[in-house]
Amino acid sequence: MNRTTKVILSSMLAAGTVFGVGLSTDTPPVNQAHAATAPYYSFTGYAGNHASFVLNQLFINSLKYDTFRMNGIKIPYTTGKNHVNKYKGTVKKYDQSFSGVNTKKTSAGSVEFKVTSHLSVKQLKEAYGKGLRALPNKHKGTKTYACSPGNKHYGISFTTKNNKVTKITIGTLGVTGEKF
């Protein structure tokens, strides 16, 4: 090889290294499908003392996808997509009462608990927005609000007195009323 050819080849090799030009041994890119994941929320412990978890956007989204679990018991009846179970069992865990519990105690139609921490109607309206509805109430001095992710008789309800939440029910409920 003459000197000119060597200079040209070494210059091309150097330029290729500097600018990243070269052969690749990688395989060409392939389109891959990725599974969509639904938001999931799990709560453990006493809920009444820490009821502000119901304002968390992850919790609210879990209601939309029937992926909420409380103290190891799944509440899969928040959207109306799943049919209400036929079980009549009840279980009490911490400060919560579960109704419609299956025989394995892994699933329930609803859960209810009294709220002892501060949770206001204003906070509910900010978190749930237009999805929050005022329900008719027969008890003087109390009001009930509910949110139904699937616009059916499922979701979450809040019993209030003096604009403070006193009780929360999650799961199967009768939701009617006016939207805000």
Indicate residue ranges for each PLM-predicted region:
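A structural detector for beta-sheet-dominated domains
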Residues: N71, T78, K114-T116, S148-G150, ...
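Short helix/turn-capping signatures at newly exposed starts of structured segments
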Residues: G22-G131, G177-F180
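Sec-dependent N-terminal signal peptides of Gram-positive bacterial secreted proteins and lipoproteins
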Residues: M1-Q32
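Extracellular structured ligand-interaction cores
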Residues: S110, H153-G155, V165
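Broad, structure-driven detector of short, well-ordered beta-strand segments within folded domains
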Residues: S99, Y154-N162
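Hydrophobic residues embedded in beta-strands of well-ordered beta-sheets
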Residues: T106-A108, K143, V165-T166
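Short, low-complexity, Pro/Ser/Thr/Gly-rich segments in the mature regions of secreted, periplasmic
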Residues: K164-F180
